């Protein structure tokens, strides 16, 4: 099991790996570019090579990229949709160059056109972008179901995957806070939640997870992360979650609202909670 947090690569991949090491991490997540928009930073091959060497030296697991929030693959507006496709396609190429195997993508928001229309739009966009030899697996993130978000139910993620021409390059990233907000009771019975995921989507598609507590109650459809043990999921439930055998070998990253010192403390707590 690889434990980490969301870090910045603004100073390069090598710097981010060293920061990860300083907090006891063996993986990390990062944005492919400014999360609110803007041009992508040019990649430095030497920096990438040094970061790969460091990761191998310290037994890192796979890194996880995260697409910017500005892309909406479900957008009904052509200009917005075209921007999302262009950005995602470019970032897949960039992450393949950086040898980052996973990229998390929010499915998108249907903006009032309805879930089915949103799913159709997402699958159409992905079918235009995805290639069997792209070298990066796109991970659809399970959402909390806020507003017009697509992906708040496992069935919605399954419908997207079912519409793909190359489904083998698509997986899923779950988030403990999003699951709780969407109405999946990770506090009382995470095993039952994963059983439902396996039945509807298949555990073989679960490639990464975000570990967050929640400020909002079960089924609130609100995405408000909390520090581990300081939210409504709680330490006991999160410890049980971390010890589920389906998570062994996966990169698990924090997205909690803290500073680097909080990440260091939370990673130490997660490691101490592991029984295997």
Swiss-Prot record:
**One example of a Gene Ontology biological process annotation:** base-excision repair
Entry EC number(s): 3.1.21.2
The cofactors named for this UniProt entry are:
Zn(2+)
Return the cofactor note field.
Binds 3 Zn(2+) ions.
Record's catalysed reaction(s): Endonucleolytic cleavage to 5'-phosphooligonucleotide end-products
Where on this chain does Zn(2+) 3 bind? 178, 223, 225
The text of the family note is: Belongs to the AP endonuclease 2 family.
Could you identify this protein by its name? Probable endonuclease 4
Name of the gene encoding the protein in the UniProt record? nfo
């Amino acid at each position: 099991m690889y434990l980490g947090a969301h870090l910045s690569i603004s100073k390069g991949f090598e710097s981010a790996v060293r920061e990860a090491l300083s907090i006891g991490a063996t993986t990390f997540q990062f944005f492919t570019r400014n999360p609110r928009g803007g041009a992508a930073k040019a990649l430095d091959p030497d920096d990438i090579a040094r970061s790969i060497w460091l990761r191998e030296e310290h037994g890192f697991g796979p890194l996880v990229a995260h697409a910017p929030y500005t892309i909406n693959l479900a957008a009904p507006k052509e200009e917005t949709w075209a921007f999302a496709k262009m950005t995602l396609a470019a970032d897949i190429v960039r992450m393949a160059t950086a040898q980052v195997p996973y990229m998390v993508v929010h499915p998108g928001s249907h903006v009032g056109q309805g879930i089915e229309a949103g799913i159709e739009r997402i699958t159409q966009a992905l079918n235009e972008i995805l290639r069997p030899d792209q070298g990066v697996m796109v991970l659809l993130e399970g959402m909390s179901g806020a507003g017009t978000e697509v992906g708040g139910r496992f069935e919605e993620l399954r419908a997207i995957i079912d519409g793909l021409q190359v489904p083998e390059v698509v997986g899923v990233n779950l988030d403990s806070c999003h699951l709780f907000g969407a109405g999946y009771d990770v506090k009382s019975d995470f095993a039952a939640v994963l059983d439902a995921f396996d039945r509807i989507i298949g555990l073989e598609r679960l490639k990464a997870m975000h570990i967050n507590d929640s400020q909002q109650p079960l089924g609130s459809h609100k995405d408000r992360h909390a520090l581990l043990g300081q939210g409504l999921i709680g330490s006991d439930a999160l410890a049980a979650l971390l010890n589920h055998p389906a998570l062994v070998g996966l990169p698990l990253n924090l997205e909690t609202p803290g500073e680097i010192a909080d990440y260091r403390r939370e990673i130490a707590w997660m490691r101490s909670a592991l029984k295997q």
